[in-house]
């Protein structure tokens, strides 16, 4: 009897050891990972590798942790240990993160843009030397406006045409150094509160051709999240982006065991079984040792499983968990496919070039099919894969590349361009030319930017080509002289009235009785100050001293402050900036080709075939024509 008890005990110990040494995920294609615990890898009764098969340093690979002590001070010790541990146990290591507006070295704040860029380059180069074969990288973290966009983003190109050029640059830099790594954009509140902003950001950098391979949803917002809301948001994001997804920082922060279990049981299968989900990383697992209140997201407490952990062990042994598909079989990236149009906004009627960057890790490309709006346009068989498309309709056009390898495997990538109508342009060269009330646009000299009106009737900069887009309200202005004003002190100055594009009466933004007895009817399209200057009187920017400087452009000085306008902020500068006042076909579109200063010699198709004389414009069918070298739209 005593011998039987001993044998039974040995059997139990053996069974326990076997259970403990088995990682929770038995799926060969997607991982269930975790992070370090207060700088330690193994923590608690079970070793890290006995539970998880992917690791992310909680802090050890953040720039501040590595180089926060000074430009010449590098501390790679913690990250080295984690990287080596992952290689020892043959599972993925994720570098978290290269570019983030939090936990970066604060000495960066004191550098010029040029030196900031040099520091970023050195940071990435050094990380590349240390970890040349890293499998995954959070290239940019939490850049949604209001989160933590990098304060040093101007060093990477600033907002630019996409609004996120600096992020595109960061991904290009990462891809140059780690072409085989899975490059990820990572952010929070993606399932609640910031879903649309997340989609907008990732869509714009994807469409700009950034070499982004996946998006990371941190998922801290899932505590208390309604299941329907979660499912709908996850589907909405995927339908918009059509890219691999990582659940990158999952936790359910609650002291209540039943609540934590409920959300684990509801949410984990949804994300894990989605074939576009490449893996799930929990953001800590030891109770009291996570970033949440009292560490209450931990699923092992005092060495024992909380109910959520017990369930997680059981779920990971099910066939559904074991057989769930992944966009990265074997947890590695086979295909790098990116679609890069020459610009996100292109003129109607002009050919736009599209570069399809395609590279396989082990396979061979047979051909690349290029689609526009789901219609096959070209089949490309040789690199470089360059396509061309001439949009003939205004609006958004969806681009898609489908790469087929010699074994028949297909890989897809989306992008898009927006086509606009280019009405042509003629810059005015004196105030006399704009005193007759004709509409004009205001563009910044030397910049591809134009003034426009936001929803709050304030001004800012938009892409210059949008000034030619009649569908966007608020790009056109009229100049109104105050020569007949009862206030003799302002008779040599001007009001700027902003027009609506449907020819509705332009009105004054202000209250009745203000603006030197000008009529007002409430909220309307009227340019007074710029951005947050509500023009209820002269000091708030209602009246401008406008001068034309030969060969340079127009200057705008607010007569209340005596300071000049430069940008989308108030007029606050001692020195003038220069602007073009230019005609762009009128507020209601082009009716006849009168934007040129000399008589057109004829009207041609886009293919160069002459179809009419200049005075026969009205006989032509609607379309896009070349008139004196410019594209003109006839409606």
Region roles according to the model:
Residues 23-58:
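Boundary/entry segment of secreted carbohydrate-active catalytic domains
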Residues 33-46, 63-77, 104, 144-148, ...:
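Acidic-and-aromatic substrate-binding clefts and catalytic sites of carbohydrate-active enzymes
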Residues 50-68, 77-192, 254-256:
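Substrate-binding cleft and catalytic face of glycoside hydrolase catalytic domains
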Residues 67, 126, 138, 142-160, ...:
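Aromatic-rich peripheral "rim/lid" segments of glycoside hydrolase catalytic domains that contact
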Residues 75-89, 160-183, 193-259, 268-272, ...:
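Glycoside hydrolase catalytic-domain groove-lining segments
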Residues 329-425:
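Long, low-complexity serine/threonine/glycine- and acidic-rich segments characteristic of extracellular
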Residues 367-372, 589-635:
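C-terminal outer-membrane/trafficking sorting elements
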Residues 423-586:
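Lectin-like carbohydrate-binding module/patch detector with strong preference for beta-trefoil
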């Amino acid at each position: 009897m005593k011998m039987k008890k001993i044998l039974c005990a040995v059997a139990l110990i053996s069974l326990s050891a076997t259970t403990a040494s088995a990682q929770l995920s038995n799926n060969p294609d997607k991982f269930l990972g975790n992070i370090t615990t207060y700088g330690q890898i193994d923590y608690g009764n079970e070793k890290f590798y006995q539970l998880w098969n992917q690791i992310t340093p909680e802090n050890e690979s953040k720039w501040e942790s590595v180089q926060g002590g000074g430009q010449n001070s590098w501390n790679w010790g913690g990250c080295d240990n984690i990287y080596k541990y992952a290689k020892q146990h043959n599972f993925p290591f994720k570098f978290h993160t290269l570019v983030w507006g939090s936990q970066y070295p604060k000495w960066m704040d004191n550098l010029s843009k040029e030196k900031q860029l040099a520091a970023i380059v050195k940071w990435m180069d050094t990380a590349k030397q240390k970890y040349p074969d890293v499998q995954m990288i959070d290239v940019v973290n939490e850049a949604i406006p209001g989160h933590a966009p990098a304060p040093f983003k101007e060093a990477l190109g600033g907002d630019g045409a996409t609004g996120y050029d600096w992020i595109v640059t960061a991904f290009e830099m990462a891809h140059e150094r780690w072409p085989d790594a899975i490059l990820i954009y990572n952010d929070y509140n993606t399932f609640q509160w910031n879903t649309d902003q997340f989609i907008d950001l990732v869509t714009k950098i994807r469409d700009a051709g950034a070499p982004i391979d996946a998006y990371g949803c941190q998922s801290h917002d899932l505590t208390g999240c309604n299941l329907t809301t979660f499912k709908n948001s996850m589907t909405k994001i995927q339908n918009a982006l059509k890219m691999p997804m990582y659940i990158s920082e999952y936790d359910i922060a609650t002291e209540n065991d039943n609540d934590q279990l409920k959300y684990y049981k509801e949410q984990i299968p949804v994300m894990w079984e989605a074939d576009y989900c490449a893996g799930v990383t929990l953001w800590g697992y030891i109770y009291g040792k996570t970033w949440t209140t009292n560490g209450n997201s931990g699923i092992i407490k005092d060495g024992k499983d909380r109910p959520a952990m017990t369930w997680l062990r059981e779920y990971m042994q099910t066939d559904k968990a074991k057989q769930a598909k992944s966009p990265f079989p074997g947890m590695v990236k086979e295909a790098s496919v990116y679609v890069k149009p020459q610009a996100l906004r292109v003129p109607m009627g002009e050919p736009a070039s599209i570069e399809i960057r395609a590279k396989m890790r082990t396979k061979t490309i047979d051909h690349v099919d290029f689609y526009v709006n789901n219609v096959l346009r070209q089949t490309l068989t040789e690199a470089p894969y360059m396509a061309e498309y001439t949009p003939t309709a205004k609006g958004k056009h969806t681009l898609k590349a489908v790469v087929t390898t010699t074994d028949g495997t297909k890989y897809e990538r989306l992008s898009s361009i927006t086509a606009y109508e280019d009405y042509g342009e003629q810059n005015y060269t004196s105030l006399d030319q704009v005193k007759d009330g004709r509409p004009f646009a205001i563009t910044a000299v030397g910049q591809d930017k134009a003034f426009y009106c936001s929803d709050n009737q304030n001004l800012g900069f938009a892409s210059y080509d949008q000034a030619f887009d009649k569908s966007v309200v608020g790009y056109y202005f009229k100049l109104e002289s105050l020569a007949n004003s009862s206030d003799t002190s302002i008779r040599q100055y001007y009001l700027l009235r902003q027009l609506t594009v449907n020819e509705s009466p332009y009105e004054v933004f202000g209250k009745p009785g203000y603006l030197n007895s000008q009529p007002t009817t409430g909220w309307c399209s009227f340019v007074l100050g710029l951005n947050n200057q509500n023009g209820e009187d002269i000091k708030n920017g209602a009246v401008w001293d406008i001068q034309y400087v030969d060969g340079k452009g127009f200057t705008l000085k607010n007569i209340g402050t005596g300071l000049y306008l430069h940008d989308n902020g108030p007029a606050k500068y001692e020195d003038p900036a220069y602007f073009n006042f230019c005609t762009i076909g009128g507020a209601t579109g082009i009716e006849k080709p009168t934007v040129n200063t000399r008589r057109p010699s004829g009207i041609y198709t886009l293919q160069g075939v002459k179809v009419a004389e200049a005075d026969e414009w009205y006989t032509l069918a609607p379309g896009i024509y070349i008139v004196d070298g410019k594209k003109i739209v006839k409606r």
